[in-house]
């Protein structure tokens, strides 16, 4: 009877049931982690849910052996949901806000990203590290943290361990920058505006920039976020350039497909930027987009955190940490020098 019932089930229904059974356990675990991260953020607003989520993933995967049934859903979150989160990230950007920074500061931001990437690649070459690992760290530290790592990973042949290492380093060094930039701003006697621009130009994750800008105070938060979002906008051309380079080199993915000239999620990101900049969206829509972006990226961060085995991180050696320190120092220095030059006199 059961065999006849199964045979009589429409193929689409069978497929849908199979997909649900495959991904539900992992996605349910990610959802619980996102809920916990959101609750922590509600009571401690200075703590990013993205950081909480990745820490939860790291702790959980190193304390217990996760059931194999959760693996497909966790992998889906760390890849597909992350890219969808990047699409909704575009709703945070408004061209007019970025243009209000003025040409000199926009030129500085381009120098921060370009100088950070090329300088980090040079340091990685001197350290004789694998080029794909170097590129992930360079873009993550120079553009927008884990989202940039994911964006670059989507157009290169990076290994999973390299992605996880780059994200872990972004979390570690970006978190250390939260108290450092406000402290250095005070020691150097910088104004809140300059301190905010410095924070936005040097710190890796948007959430980390928000935390540092809030500590600096005096209006630093607003300008810090705008500068940071200007860096985020450069993810699109960088990803497109890297994808084009991969096509020129004849790279194909494991399924035999060549990378697109411009990744689909980058086109979605740009579409959201254009939508936000040209259409007067209701506050409710913007808020919903922000919530979706945070939830999706938090789920992705939890998924990436579940791939961080402390033992494996120890085995990668000291070179990635040296490169991360060098990249952070370089980006921070360019951001400070450029910001000061644009505000002389």
Swiss-Prot record:
It comes from the Bacteria. The chain crosses the membrane at residues 15-37, 44-66, 81-103, 105-124, 134-156, 163-185, 205-227, 261-280, 285-307, 320-342. It is found in: Cell membrane. InterPro entries: UPF0324_pro (IPR018383). Keywords: Cell membrane, Membrane, Transmembrane, Transmembrane helix. It is a multi-pass membrane protein. Signal peptide: none annotated. One of its GO terms (cellular component) is plasma membrane. PANTHER family: INNER MEMBRANE PROTEIN YEIH-RELATED (PTHR30106), UPF0324 INNER MEMBRANE PROTEIN YEIH (PTHR30106:SF2). This is UPF0324 membrane protein Cgl0015/cg0018. The lineage of its organism: Bacteria, Bacillati, Actinomycetota, Actinomycetes, Mycobacteriales.
């Amino acid at each position: 009877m059961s065999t006849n019932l199964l045979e009589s089930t429409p193929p689409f229904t069978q497929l849908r049931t199979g997909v649900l059974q495959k991904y539900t356990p992992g996605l349910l675990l990610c959802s619980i982690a996102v809920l916990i991260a959101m609750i922590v953020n509600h009571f401690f607003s200075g703590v990013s849910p993205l950081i909480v989520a990745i820490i939860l993933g790291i702790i959980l995967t190193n304390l217990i052996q996760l059931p194999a049934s959760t693996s497909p859903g966790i992998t889906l979150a760390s890849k597909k949901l992350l890219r969808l989160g990047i699409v909704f990230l575009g709703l945070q950007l408004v061209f007019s806000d970025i243009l209000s920074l003025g040409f000199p500061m926009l030129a500085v931001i381009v120098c921060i990203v370009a100088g950070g990437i090329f300088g980090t690649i040079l340091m990685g070459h001197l350290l004789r590290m694998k080029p794909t690992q170097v590129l992930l760290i360079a873009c993550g530290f120079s553009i927008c943290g884990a989202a940039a790592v994911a964006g670059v990973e989507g157009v290169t042949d990076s290994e999973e361990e390299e992605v996880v290492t780059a994200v872990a380093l972004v979390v570690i060094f970006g978190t250390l920058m939260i108290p450092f930039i406000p402290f250095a701003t005070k020691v150097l006697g910088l104004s809140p505006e300059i301190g905010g621009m410095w924070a936005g130009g040097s710190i890796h994750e948007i959430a980390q920039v928000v935390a540092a800008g809030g500590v600096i105070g005096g209006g630093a938060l607003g300008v810090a976020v705008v500068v940071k979002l200007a860096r985020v906008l450069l993810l699109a051309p960088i990803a497109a350039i890297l994808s084009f380079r991969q096509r020129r080199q004849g790279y194909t993915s494991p399924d035999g497909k060549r990378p697109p000239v411009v990744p689909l999620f980058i086109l979605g990101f740009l579409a959201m930027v254009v939508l936000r900049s040209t259409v007067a969206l209701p506050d409710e829509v913007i808020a919903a987009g922000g919530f979706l972006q945070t939830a999706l990226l938090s789920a992705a961060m939890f998924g990436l955190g579940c791939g961080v085995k402390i033992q494996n991180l120890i085995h990668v050696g000291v070179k990635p940490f040296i490169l991360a320190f060098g990249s952070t120092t370089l980006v921070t220095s360019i951001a400070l020098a450029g910001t000061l030059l644009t505000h002389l006199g």
